[in-house]
Structures are given as C-alpha cells and as structure tokens.
Amino acid sequence: MSRYGADTTTDEVLEGIDFSGKRVLITGSSSGLGEESARALSAKGAAIIMAARDPQKNEAAAARVREKVPGADLELRTLDLCSLESVRGFAKGFLADHPRLDVLLDNAGVMCCPRGTTSDGFETQLGTNHIGHFLLTGLLAPVLLDSAPSRVVVLSSAAHLITGMDFDDPMFERRDYDPWQAYGQSKTANALFALELDRRLAEEGVSAYSVHPGRIVTELGRHMNEE
C-alpha cells in the first residue's frame, strides 16, 4: 500500500531525492500544479524551464518560487500549446540552447471550457491538452533520448473514465459539444499517449507515465461553477 494520501505534500514525496544536475521542463508553469512543481523540484536542486503562454503570469509565478526558494535555477520561456507554430518554435529554441533534458512534465491544460478551436482548428481541449503536448514531446524526443535515463510525465486525470476516444468525431463536428465529454476525451488521449510512448521508448531509456493529480483547486477549474 502506498504511504501517500490526500494530505501528502510535494516536499514529502521528494524527501531524500536529489535533483542536482537535472534539467526539468514544465509546461503550464505560471500557476497551480506547474508552479508548485517548479518550486518543489528547484528546492531539490533541479534546473527548471518554466514554459507558459502568458509571460507576465510566468514571471509572477517565478517570483513566487524565488521567494520560497532563494537561488532557484529558473529559466522562463513562452509556449502556447494552442498553436502548433508556437510549439515548433519553442522546441527549436530549446534544442538550440539545451543539449540535455532529464524530465518533461506535460502539465498545462484546460478543463470544461466553452466550445472553441485552437489556431490550427482543433477542438480546444483536445488540441491544448493532448495535440500540443504530443507535438512538443515528439520534437523533444531526440534530447530526451540523448539524456537517457529520462522520463516524460503526462498529467492525465480520472476524468478519462468519462469517455474513450471518439475517433469518428474527435472534434465534435457532427455531435453536440459537451465540455465534460471533451475534457474526458482529452485525458484519455493523454493516458493512451503515455502508454504508447513508454512502449516505444522505454528500452532506449525514456520512461513515460500518465498520472491523476487528484482533486486540487487550481486555475484549471476556472470554467466550473461552485457546485
């Protein structure tokens, strides 16, 4: 039985672990779990790349991290997962600057937002939560392989139980849009992606995991009502 539970903190999970010399890239670092991951991992010596869509919010998050972890090794970069052009530009810049990546934390996401599409025409939740990360991870695969043993952690959710993938209409073009169905589908995609990525790359030293973070009040739930 796991010794961790609903009250377990990030610091308790990382007790006794040294991340000195490790480089960790976190998407969605400007708030919530991304910001907390940056704080906890930097406190253990990791060099953190904080990647987020809004540079000002990312700067504010980094300032909060540095207040708690003086001397934290933080690098801030702009990444918009709703734009494949942005993802490609981000990956190109990262690979040019960094020959090593030990951990990729695919954390950024949206939940239960109104119907919409990304700049590339994908349904917003599937496009942001899965497709953007799918491309990012693929583009960074060479540096992950060069840095092996390395790992990819994909933030999925127990919401994957809501629905599987509707491969006939993944973008809700021929059915009524339901924000929970769309969110659940994106989380199923996250989980399936991590499983297949691990199957393909584990023997080469890149492990992939999908995780359910639990019910945590963060900015992710901004589209939900109080109930």
Regions found by a protein language model. Give the residues of each.
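Rossmann-fold NAD(P)H-dependent dehydrogenase/reductase core
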Residues: 2-225
